[in-house]
Amino acid sequence: MVNSIHLEPRQHCRGTVTLPGSKSIANRALLMAALCQTPVILHNLLVSDDTSRMREALNALGVSFEDDKLITRVNGLGGGWNKPASELYLGNAGTAMRPLIAVLAATLKNEHQAVVLKGDARMHERPVKHLIDAIQPRGAGVNYLGETGFPPLEMTSGLKPGDFEIDGSVSSQFISALLMALPLLPGDSTLTLKGNVVSRPYIELTLQMLSDFGISIKEDSPQCYAIPGGQCYQSPGEYWVEGDASAASYWMAAALLGKGPVEIIGVGKNSIQGDKRFAEVIEAMGASVSYRKNSMTVSGTGSVQGIDQDFNDIPDAAMTVAPLALFANKPTTIRNVANWRVKETDRLHAMATELRKLGATVDEGEDFLRIEPLKHWRHIAIDTYDDHRMAMCFSLVAFSSAGVTINDPGCCAKTYPDYFSEFSRLCHS
């Protein structure tokens, strides 16, 4: 494994890039397909660490897969697991851990069908307490095997329909998990969201996909959902996994710094992903964007406008703004991103630390970063904290006069294994 990658200074970025399939869509699609009673053909399924963990878990529950080039056939079990494994290892895949907690609570048949969910060291630091607190009062059998509120944990049966409440301010994955699980219960349920809901576009993504898989949920208000019970996931026959809109943000930023044009294939005006809205951010920072149905083209002048913006809806893509801020004409403030602290690493602290190593002046608050433009560049090695987004974000520093070294670039295998080879292809001096 390459321990670091040295990026010489770049001035230009142009060409065409095809995005890998979205991790968020891929893992939802895998689980929904596994809950269907008839096969589902998935197209453009991302092959990465996170999707591999979900596939391995579903396979251990009895689901089988058939791969043929860019097509994956999922032979679902309709929610009735065939002699499920007693332990599922999910690495650091939050998009696997959180929904499986809820779905297993809804589908395991008896107390003798216990399943342990565990992950790597970082996963055991990522909170699930709000999700567990939502399902335990309705009968879900959950035993913490380590620190209370965190994996590893043991799941057994018992979840009953009824009224559910959950704090929406920590992670939208908890809400998506319940939306996927509650339709499987024998009776009707309601789900009420408390607090300031974070990453709402990911909830909208889940609702759209549930509809595609035959599940009906009524949104009584932005904070309350009526969920009929006794539903069955219906195979759509074939399902296309969109390109990763979060990954598109790096190419939009590179096109702004390197002038472009860069055609980004896989996400366009018809995308169901909230992170497509990053295109509006990059326009505010000085880029020009033209949209098509499933692609967009981005160009820039090399000049970056500083911004002050609330990123509650698109926190993942918001990370890309941080390195861009170093090139800006005035300070940039990234607001309302408290949930960065419960991601693959504490992203607020990690981002501030690495920006300061470059020499930047950074104000780190509980839920914001304020970043001053950098006047004098120096070449340093960026630590990535086993976080794919840290690695990809800081690749943009290669557009400085000093270049940059990225430690542990292999962490990009989580969502974008080919990122640095694509970066070298499109970005040059």
Curated annotation (Swiss-Prot):
Any one annotated GO CC term: cytoplasm
A Pfam family matched in the record: EPSP_synthase
Binding site for 3-phosphoshikimate: 23-24, 28, 171-173, 199, 316, 339, 343
Membership in a protein family: Belongs to the EPSP synthase family.
Residues noted as binding phosphoenolpyruvate in the record, renumbered to the chain: 23, 94, 126, 173, 347, 389, 414
Entry's EC annotation: 2.5.1.19
Protein name: 3-phosphoshikimate 1-carboxyvinyltransferase
Compartments it resides in: Cytoplasm
Catalytic reaction list: 3-phosphoshikimate + phosphoenolpyruvate = 5-O-(1-carboxyvinyl)-3-phosphoshikimate + phosphate
Pathway: Metabolic intermediate biosynthesis; chorismate biosynthesis; chorismate from D-erythrose 4-phosphate and phosphoenolpyruvate: step 6/7
Keyword hit for Transferase: yes
InterPro entries given in the database record: Enolpyruvate_Tfrase_dom (IPR001986), Enolpyruvate_Tfrase_sf (IPR036968), EPSP_synthase (IPR006264), EPSP_synthase_CS (IPR023193), RNA3'P_cycl/enolpyr_Trfase_a/b (IPR013792)
Species annotation: Idiomarina loihiensis (strain ATCC BAA-735 / DSM 15497 / L2-TR)
Subunit structure: Monomer.
Gene3D superfamilies cross-referenced by the UniProt entry: Enolpyruvate transferase domain
Any GO molecular function: 3-phosphoshikimate 1-carboxyvinyltransferase activity
Keyword annotations from UniProtKB, A to Z: Amino-acid biosynthesis, Aromatic amino acid biosynthesis, Cytoplasm, Transferase
The organism's place on the tree of life at top rank: Bacteria
Function: Catalyzes the transfer of the enolpyruvyl moiety of phosphoenolpyruvate (PEP) to the 5-hydroxyl of shikimate-3-phosphate (S3P) to produce enolpyruvyl shikimate-3-phosphate and inorganic phosphate.
